[in-house]
A protein has these predicted regions:
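Single, functionally critical "micro-switch" positions that shape active/binding sites
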Residues: 67, 80, 149
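Acidic (Asp/Glu)-rich catalytic clusters
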Residues: 34, 54-57, 93-103, 128-149, ...
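Aromatic- and glycine-enriched glycan-recognition loops and surfaces
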Residues: 20-32, 80-91, 126-134
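Active-site cradle of extracellular carbohydrate-active enzymes
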Residues: 108-166, 170-171, 177-178
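Proline-centered loop/turn at the N-terminus of a beta-strand
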Residues: 62, 105-107, 146, 231
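A short alpha/beta connector and helix-capping loop motif
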Residues: 76-99, 103-109
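C-terminal active-site subregion of NodB/CE4 polysaccharide deacetylases
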Residues: 1-66, 71-77, 157-270
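Generic hydrophobic/packing signal
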Residues: 4, 40, 93, 105-109, ...
Length: 270
């Protein structure tokens, strides 16, 4: 198995071309993935195969689409105040599937805390509340999405009081005790699962693309029955394979791991 996990941020909107708009980039990238004959599969399917030791049951190369932060642009067509109408990821996936007659799927990793999301929207989105949870259940029901866990509050500097014992923010490496990890991982998963029951809630994407040694070496592997998480993803570029560490899985982020369609083509072929 060679699994390439691609990550987009639907709120990365500084224009309306590939370089400045992750929604535009996603639409183009789906076409390229299809042209290369690489199937797009749910991330949970890849994780299940990895854990079961059944990676050989998947096609030789597969791709998975992930989205970070859970902005409304993932599911709702919106008008951006500076860049105009934007097709949501849902609309992009539907159009792609209809055009090619193949399934498309994405896992959106969302921030659980409603209060944290409100503060992030107020400070980072000109108070446009584009980071709600009203669409999570509908996203799962559409068959196009799983809703995964991106922590309780992202340890975002935009949140006045993050759930970290010393109030530290800006790096998920600060999560290095059971109490903090339990809230950021378990409580977040349980909130998401209550809002939108789905297989993706058992997947965790570390905020800022980084975990801590405590999470990777102790909390995730030793407390699985409590936190209910099956795998954790970083933002480190790379390819998943049968020997990958399930608590330190790679993802390739649009705008850093690749910046152009040609970059992505090389990444997919390597």
């Amino acid at each position: 198995m060679r699994a390439i996990v691609l990550t987009y941020h639907s709120g990365n909107l500084a224009g309306n071309d590939y370089a400045t708009n992750n929604l535009v980039a996603l639409a183009e990238d789906l076409e390229q993935i299809h042209a290369l004959g690489i199937p797009i599969v749910p991330l949970r399917s890849i994780v299940d195969a990895l854990i079961a030791g059944a990676a050989a049951a998947l096609p030789k190369t597969v791709a998975a689409i992930t989205l970070d932060d859970g902005l409304d642009f993932d599911f709702v067509d919106l008008v951006h105040p500076f860049h105009g109408p934007q097709r949501s990821v849902r609309s992009i996936l539907r159009s792609f599937s209809s055009r090619h007659g193949v399934a498309a799927h994405a896992t959106t990793f969302v921030i659980a805390s409603p209060d944290a999301r409100r503060q992030i929207a107020r400070r980072e989105m000109l108070d446009h509340q584009w980071i709600g949870d009203h669409w999570w259940r509908a996203a799962v029901a559409s068959g196009l999405f799983h809703v995964g866990n991106h922590s309780w509050d992202h340890l975002s500097p935009s949140v006045a009081q993050v759930q970290q014992r010393e109030g530290k923010s800006g790096s998920f490496g600060f999560i290095d005790t059971f109490e903090d990890a339990d809230l950021q991982v378990r409580a977040a998963r349980e909130f998401i699962e209550a809002k939108a029951p789905n297989p993706g809630s058992a997947l965790f994407a570390c905020p800022y693309g980084e975990g801590s040694a405590y999470l990777v070496e102790q909390f995730f592997p030793l407390h699985l029955a409590r936190h209910g998480t099956l795998a954790a993803f970083t933002g480190t570029p790379g390819v998943m394979h049968a020997a990958s560490n399930r608590w330190l899985l790679p993802r390739n982020t649009c705008g850093t791991a690749w910046r152009t369609p040609d970059d992505l083509a090389r990444l997919l072929r390597e």
